[in-house]
Amino acid sequence: MKMIVGLGNPGSKYAKTKHNIGFMVIDQLCEKYNVTLNKHDFEAEYGSFKYEGETVLLVKPLTFMNDSGRSVGPLMSYYQVGIDELLVIQDDMDLTMGKLRLRQKGSAGGHNGIKSIIAHTKSQTFKRLKIGIQHPQKSTVVNWVLTPFDKDGAPVINQAIDQACEAIDDWCQNDDFMKTMNKFN
């Protein structure tokens, strides 16, 4: 079983903000695979589909970004998902707008949602799919991540979401994250 977690903040107020790029990817995967996030336990909404016989959980933690691990850890335990089968989709200010970067493991890199997942899983060895939102030029970090993409950024991000879904499909299909990294990084 694979578990794909998109990071974001719950509520319509945050729906189109940069920090919610993980939720946006999950939404597109739900559309592609006809999944409804109809389960509401573990402070998350989630659903599943079968990919060539393997169950894939799509998860949106509802704890707000900085407490995402409070949802992810218990879900992993309940469904007996190994740390090697967890993929977390996150925004990354150190990457240019729309750039994808896949990683096998790593530190939180200043991302509080990732920091929370590391704390609750007691591991840094889970997979990441990072999508660049670039660093703010003039605004503060909080204002930057909690504002929507502008008219120039929106098409770039829509393309990045498509690429992220392709990368996830690739990983589900070949079950070799290193191959997927080499293809999409």
UniProtKB/Swiss-Prot annotation:
GO terms for molecular function: peptidyl-tRNA hydrolase activity; tRNA binding. Its EC number is 3.1.1.29. The record marks N9 as: Discriminates between blocked and unblocked aminoacyl-tRNA. The active site is at H19 (proton acceptor). PROSITE patterns: PEPT_TRNA_HYDROL_1, PEPT_TRNA_HYDROL_2. TRNA binds at Y14, F64, N66, N112. It is found in: Cytoplasm. GO terms for cellular component: cytoplasm. Belongs to the PTH family. Monomer. NCBIfam families: pth (TIGR00447). Hydrolyzes ribosome-free peptidyl-tRNAs (with 1 or more amino acids incorporated), which drop off the ribosome during protein synthesis, or as a result of ribosome stalling. Catalyzes the release of premature peptidyl moieties from peptidyl-tRNA molecules trapped in stalled 50S ribosomal subunits, and thus maintains levels of free tRNAs and 50S ribosomes. This is Peptidyl-tRNA hydrolase. It comes from Latilactobacillus sakei subsp. sakei (strain 23K).
